Amino acid sequence: IYGPNQDLLFKIYEKPDLSSTKIITPIKRNNIDIISMGFFLDSNTSATWRGPLLSGAIKQIINSSKWGNLDFLLIDMPPGTGDSYLTIFNELSVDHFILITSSNKLSISDSKRTISMLNKLDINILGYIENNIFDMSNSGNDNLFPKDDIHKLGTFKFNKNMYDFDPSYNNPDNKDIIIKIENII
C-alpha cells in the first residue's frame, strides 16, 4: 500500500481491467496473477492513509479481485505489526506465513516484532528466507532467529538478473527453497 512496486518488479505498464461490476482482474506475468496498489496510484503519488482508509483499500483489493482457483496467495508486506497486517488476517484465513528479511540489525528487529505478532495470532510460520540480493558477497547466515525456532528456508543470493528485476529469469537457486516449502506444507 505505502510503497507499492510489484508493477515495477514485473515490468507491468498496463492497468488491470476494472469491469463495470467493480471486479479487479489481475494482470498475469510468468503465470502469476498480480494485483498491486501501484496499478491504481500515480508513480509519484503517496498513499497517506491510516486506519479505516487503509483497511478499506486492503479489503477492496482482497474482496474485489478475481483470483480464480489459487494454490497459494502471496502477499508482499513490509515488516511490521500494524493495521495492514490485522486487516489481512481478519479478511483471509491465513494458513502459513513466510518471513523474508535481510540480515541487517534493523530488518531482524522488525522481523522479530512480526514474529511476536504472528505467535499471538497463532499463525504458523513456515520459516524465513534471507534476502541477500543486494549483497554481492553472497554470504548467508546460518540462522537469524535461533531463539524463535524459525528455520531458514534458503537465501536469495545476489544475481544480476534478480538485481535488474528480470521477471522472465527462473533462478535455479530458488529450487531448493521451493522444495523446502513444498515439503513443509
Annotate the PLM regions.
Residues 1-44, 55:
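Phosphate-binding loop that captures ATP/GTP phosphates
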Residues 37-53, 57-87:
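Switch II (G3) loop of P-loop NTPases
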